Amino acid sequence: MLRLRCKAKNGTHLMQGLTHQSCVQELKDKIEELTGIPCDVQKIMVGYPPSSLDLRNGEAHLKDYPIKSGDTLIVEEEKNKPKPPVQPTVTKGPSFEVTPVVERRVVPADNSCLFTSVNYVMEGGVYDPACASEMRGLIAQIVASDPTAYSEAVLGKTNEEYCTWIRRDDTWGGAIEVSILSKFYQCEICVVDTQTVRVDRFGEDAGYTKRVLLIYDGIHYDPLQKVLPGSDVPAQTVFSTVDDVILAQALELADEARRKRQFTDVNRFALRCMVCQTGLVGQKEAREHAKETGHTNFGEV
């Protein structure tokens, strides 16, 4: 089954019931049903930047075209003659001059920012605040299924304690959870640190072909995406692992944030235990306090 969306003037629509064996005419009929644009005047584009597909052969199969699960098809109505193959925005000239940029997509700081961010990039830029509970449960299931790999030495608590802990909505995700999600999605997850301006690449040696990026300021995670400024073209959140340009652009964004002091030094920031009101300094003291007392609800002072 192909998981596709189409974007037209009347909004973005989920396209269901199509597979790689579906023919072009089935695709066009589905688009007409969702957008109201007649089959014979549809201009269908895919990719980033988007380029037009030659879909004149209605009996051809979708597997013969560069259409893959997760894609968003851009659909316009052709008025007279065919337009240039790359025309995602209305410009004064015939050439496409807009340069894609990498940006941070801010998500809420609600203890579940890691899970929200990973879901956002893996779903192609779909924000779903309700996903965190499901992802926490998924991680707990994976950990519980392999107590040897996920031992107390790895988790910092027993396997059973960890599974109970990660399901709570007041706990934070970190490197362990990113590693688990990388394996689950079969995707390299790159975390760009704004304090050190480095990239931690989870799944780097696993041979994955896909890459997604998060930015991390010492406490909070946000997803990174590539967008065309001033355009309605959907953001790109999944990249090839051979695309090192995107890593360089992400590091530039992190360096800019560092110069603006947009990070939290987790070794020196002031915290307070919200259970017993004990004052603490830095991540190390917070972890030790949690280990001694079982308290895990901290607030920044």
Curated annotation (Swiss-Prot):
Biological processes per GO annotation: endoplasmic reticulum unfolded protein response; ERAD pathway; macroautophagy; protein K11-linked deubiquitination; protein K27-linked deubiquitination; protein K29-linked deubiquitination; protein K33-linked deubiquitination; protein K48-linked deubiquitination
Enzyme class label: hydrolase
Main subcellular location of this protein, as a coarse class: cytoplasm
Segments of this protein annotated with the region Variable-loop: 166-176
Region ranges (S2 site): 244-249
Chain spans, region His-loop: 216-220
Purpose of the protein: Hydrolase that can remove conjugated ubiquitin from proteins and participates in endoplasmic reticulum-associated degradation (ERAD) for misfolded lumenal proteins. May act by triming the ubiquitin chain on the associated substrate to facilitate their threading through the VCP/p97 pore. Ubiquitin moieties on substrates may present a steric impediment to the threading process when the substrate is transferred to the VCP pore and threaded through VCP's axial channel. Mediates deubiquitination of 'Lys-27'-, 'Lys-29'- and 'Lys-33'-linked polyubiquitin chains.
Protein name: Ubiquitin thioesterase OTU1
